[in-house]
């Protein structure tokens, strides 16, 4: 939220983030990019303070792919003066969804879902009505829950095209998958679970947030993974 708050109010103060079971969550990408947009960044007693009278667009090349870094700076840049170009950005569907949402409010964002996002700053944003797409990680979790219990599940109002990396691994595990434009059915009844090797990677690779669920599935498989 740091980028959107400093862009709108000129000042933001938030606690330094912690982490999760995977590890700590560094925020260097976020802070370095905000400084390039003109924000003054200070670390005080476990808090990050960012301030700026007016952010100014620039070109930013992320040193590594970061979903939250891309989203944070995209939200900051929509209210910055002039054009901002973000390179080496995350291409996750959620980044595209955020761009669509911001554009529905009056932002001018193009290129979301590619390696480069271009943002033309606007003076302000307006309210809008927006339907949030289904969560592919949540859907994948339900699919694996059915797989480990040798069940049958149908998930509706989902976009299977966003989940090819997950569905391909489920097929390799022995699940039968039937997918249409907005529905996925998994059948694992009376089947043996096969081991599947997993390597996580930025989209369109296999999502990190699905590795724990697949660990459970692989733990019940016949073989090594």
Task: For each feature predicted by the language model, list its residue ranges.
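Short, structured segments at the rim of ligand-binding sites
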Residues: 1-225
């Amino acid at each position: 939220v740091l980028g959107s708050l400093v862009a709108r109010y000129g000042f933001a103060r938030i606690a330094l983030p912690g982490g999760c079971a995977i590890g700590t969550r560094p925020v260097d990408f976020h802070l370095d990019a905000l400084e390039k947009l003109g924000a003054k960044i200070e670390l005080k007693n476990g808090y990050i303070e960012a301030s700026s009278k007016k952010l100014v667009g620039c070109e930013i090349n992320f040193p590594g792919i970061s979903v939250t870094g891309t989203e944070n700076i995209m939200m900051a840049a929509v209210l910055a003066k002039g054009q901002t170009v973000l390179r080496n950005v995350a291409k996750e569907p959620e980044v595209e969804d955020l761009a669509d949402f911001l554009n529905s409010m009056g932002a001018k964002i193009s290129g979301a879902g590619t390696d480069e996002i271009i943002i033309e700053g606007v003076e302000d944003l307006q309210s809008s009505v927006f339907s949030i797409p289904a969560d592919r990680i949540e859907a994948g979790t339900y699919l694996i829950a059915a797989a480990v219990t040798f069940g049958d599940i149908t998930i509706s109002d989902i976009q299977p095209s966003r989940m090819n990396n997950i569905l391909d691994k489920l097929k390799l595990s022995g699940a039968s998958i039937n997918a249409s434009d907005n529905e996925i059915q998994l059948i694992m009844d009376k089947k043996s679970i096969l081991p599947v090797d997993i390597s996580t990677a930025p989209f369109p690779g296999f999502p990190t947030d699905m590795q724990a669920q697949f660990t459970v599935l692989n733990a019940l498989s016949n073989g090594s993974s």
